[in-house]
Amino acid sequence: MTCTIVVGGQWGDEGKGKIISYICEKDKPSVVARGGVGPNAGHSVEVDGKKYGIRMVPTGFPNRSSKLAVGAGVLVDVDVLLKEVEMLKEFNIKDRVIIDYNCGVIEEKHKEMDKSNSHLSKEIGSTGTGCGPANVDRAMRTLRLAKEFDALKPFLGDVSDLVNEALENGENVLIEGTQGTLLSLYYGSYPYVTSNDTSASAFASDVGIGPTKVDEVIVVFKSYPTRVGEGPFPTEMDVEEAEKLGLVEYGTVTGRRRRIGYFDYDLAKKVCRLNGATAIALTCLDKYDEECHGLTNYDDITEKGLAFIKEIEEKVGVPVKIISTGPELHQTIDIR
């Protein structure tokens, strides 16, 4: 039995979707439970050359034996969820998704409020998905819950019971986080943050398990960190430099161009401390050194790539255990 939490180490877009899907294929967890704020974060998963962008369904969906749970701490957009269930029907999603009875539900009024608020949309750079206003209503105890919506009835369940019973039965559980620690309402660069905490502790709470149940915390870092929206970015490079390095990316949810920077060892160390990291997953090593593209053996990593990995381990103090060398699941080095 192991309970593993996967958390973003930067401002989101670190490649958590690929890492989570890989771990699901390798470790075969019986339950993949999603924590995080809501549909304001997108994950990209590539399966057999086809790319899927999802915002509600847990990214462990390619593993057909896993139950896919959305914890009570997560906000649900009914339309987004139903569209994803339909989009992923070849993976038998409909019979595997469990939405907690007590998930809060984002309604159209929340999205309108999010988009019309100039402070959120222009100064903060909100995604406009209604999460912030919905969380305000939750705090005011006026937000409607999943159990009140007929469209969600086929998916309803008690996620906390599901996760805890799986662990008690000696099964593997994976808890997937969204966004990144540096967007945390409490530990990020306030006010340029999301509307809730995005640390490993928060994700455990979102799905209803206590801290003593967690065995592993894997923090995901991208070799070149990115950020969508406003806010400080200490190691940000200019657009010309990013283009010269071939680093042009766009957000899964907003479609906005991502700001790109150099790896920040000091912030990485702080993030690992905040999350109690037991391991690091490093993505886009092939962007740092294109000769590493597609590698699956640690001993084949180039001198340049290996030096980068060793520098991270020395300066951050946490071992790099999973390395992504391309978008496909098999383009991964795993030394856990």
From Swiss-Prot:
Pathway: Purine metabolism; AMP biosynthesis via de novo pathway; AMP from IMP: step 1/2. The active site is at D13 (proton acceptor), H43 (proton donor). GO terms for biological process: 'de novo' AMP biosynthetic process; IMP metabolic process. One of its GO terms (molecular function) is adenylosuccinate synthase activity. Gene3D superfamilies: Adenylosuccinate Synthetase, subunit A, domain 1 (3.40.440.10), Adenylosuccinate Synthetase, subunit A, domain 2 (1.10.300.10), Adenylosuccinate Synthetase, subunit A, domain 3 (3.90.170.10). It catalyses: IMP + L-aspartate + GTP = N(6)-(1,2-dicarboxyethyl)-AMP + GDP + phosphate + 2 H(+). It is an enzyme of class 6 (ligase). Its EC number is 6.3.4.4. GTP binds at residues 12-18, 42-44, 258, 284-286, 324-326. IMP binds at D13, E14, G15, K16, N40, A41, G42, H43, T127, R141, Q179, T194, R256. Binds 1 Mg(2+) ion per subunit. Keywords: Cytoplasm, GTP-binding, Ligase, Magnesium, Metal-binding, Nucleotide-binding, Purine biosynthesis. It is found in: Cytoplasm. Signal peptide: none annotated. Substrate binds at T252, V253, T254, G255, R256, R257, R258. It comes from the Archaea. Mg(2+) binds at D13, G42. Belongs to the adenylosuccinate synthetase family. Homodimer. This is Adenylosuccinate synthetase. The lineage of its organism: Archaea, Methanobacteriati, Methanobacteriota, Methanomada group, Methanococci. The gene is purA.
